[in-house]
Design a protein with these regions (language model features):
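Glycine-rich phosphate/diphosphate-binding loop of Rossmann-like nucleotide-binding domains
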Residues: 34-48, 133-169
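Anion-binding alpha/beta catalytic cores of soluble intermediary-metabolism enzymes, centered on
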Residues: 90-155
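Positively charged, low-complexity intrinsically disordered leader regions
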Residues: 1-25
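Helix-enriched interaction subdomains in cytosolic or periplasmic regions
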Residues: 1-7, 82, 98-105
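Short, well-structured alpha-helical segments in soluble
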Residues: 71-82
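Short beta-strand segments enriched in small/hydrophobic residues
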Residues: 26-36
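Non-catalytic terminal and connector segments of soluble metabolic enzymes
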Residues: 53, 78-80, 107-110
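Short beta-strand elements in bilobed, periplasmic/extracellular small-molecule ligand-binding domains
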Residues: 51-66
């Protein structure tokens, strides 16, 4: 079965625009990216484009591929304490010399837009409200959009990443 996500995306964007217009604050996204991955460049470009369509300002912090962990930790601490920044994400993957999970865990859980801090993952795994990883949430919402129930069905997920496979399972 192949699902067309375009109608869902259009409906979701409309819903988000309405919800954003009701807020007293303007959300602001900070993206931390380390050079060296062309796919990441494309993903970040798409995120910036969608945020622009929604009127959400984005700040991109782009680091050289040989950046040290301490430099990124300092930037995350700065963004955590900045009240204007409401969401932070680290564009994955990072170069091998950087510990992805350690750096992700430096993000305040309530600013963790990818839902990848141990705090959010732990709450989610216990059935307690948490910020969910966005791709699995989008998959579930897409299934709901088309009234497709997975209850009682066998589903094969070919992915074991913390961002997609594990939360989706």
């Amino acid at each position: 079965m192949l699902l067309n996500a375009k109608p869902y995306v259009e409906a979701k964007m409309k819903e988000l625009k309405e919800r954003l217009s009701e807020l007293d604050v303007t959300p602001k996204l900070a993206i931390i990216q380390v050079e060296g991955n062309q796919a990441s460049d494309k993903y970040v470009g798409n995120k910036k484009k969608k945020c622009a369509e929604l009127g959400i300002p984005v700040e991109l912090y782009y680091f050289s591929k040989d950046v040290d962990s301490h430099t990124i930790e300092e930037k995350i601490a700065e963004l955590n304490s900045n009240d204007e920044v409401t969401g932070i994400l680290i564009q994955l993957p990072l170069p091998k010399h950087l510990d992805e999970q350690f750096l992700i865990n430096q993000i305040c859980p309530y600013k963790d837009v990818d839902g990848l801090t141990w705090y959010n993952i732990g709450r989610l795994s216990q059935g307690i409200y948490a910020i969910p990883p966005c791709t699995p949430k989008g998959v579930i919402e897409l299934m709901d959009f088309y009234d497709i129930s997975l209850e009682g069905k066998d589903v094969l997920i070919i992915n074991d990443s913390n961002l997609v496979g594990k939360p989706l399972a």
